[in-house]
């Protein structure tokens, strides 16, 4: 009887652990509109590039940006970003995309939520620390 009870309790705790782990993973997803993403992620990364000549964060962010584009514009966003990264001018990608897509994006997609890629979630804090140095 005690063995069954201990096994049942053990199984309960293991199940509880799985549930908590799944909940933690679900909470690690962050959604925001593209404008807020640019303010929170891209703008500080550009500042880090301008002040410290560190393009690492900006490049990593820009590589993910085409995935956030409307389906029919993904290829063009990627083409613009790849062209600027190829010549070492990541800071010029924003202006290029804004010139071409900003009006339409604001009109049709402004409130659309995008998922922030998990590998970028810690970037704002990391960039802030690097800017302090």
Where are the predicted features?
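Positively charged n-region of N-terminal signal peptides that target proteins for export
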Residues: 1-5
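Short Cys/His-rich local motifs and their 1-3 flanking residues in nucleic-acid-associated proteins
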Residues: 99
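Short, cysteine/histidine-rich loop/knuckle motifs that typically chelate Zn2+
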Residues: 96
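Bacterial N-terminal signal peptides
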Residues: 8-15
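Extracytoplasmic c-type cytochrome modules immediately beyond a signal peptide or single-pass transmembrane anchor
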Residues: 18-93, 102-133
């Amino acid at each position: 009887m005690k063995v069954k009870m201990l096994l049942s309790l053990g199984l309960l705790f293991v199940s509880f652990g799985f549930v908590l782990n799944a909940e933690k993973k679900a909470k690690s997803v962050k959604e925001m509109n593209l404008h807020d993403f640019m303010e929170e992620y891209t703008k500080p990364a550009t500042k880090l590039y301008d002040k410290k000549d560190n393009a690492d964060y900006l490049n990593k962010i820009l590589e993910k940006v085409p995935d956030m584009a409307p389906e029919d514009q993904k290829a063009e966003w990627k083409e613009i970003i790849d062209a600027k990264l190829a010549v070492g001018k990541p800071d010029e990608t924003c202006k290029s995309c804004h010139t071409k897509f900003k009006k339409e994006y604001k009109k049709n997609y402004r409130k659309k939520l995008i998922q922030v890629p998990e590998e970028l979630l810690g970037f704002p804090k990391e960039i802030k620390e690097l800017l302090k140095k």
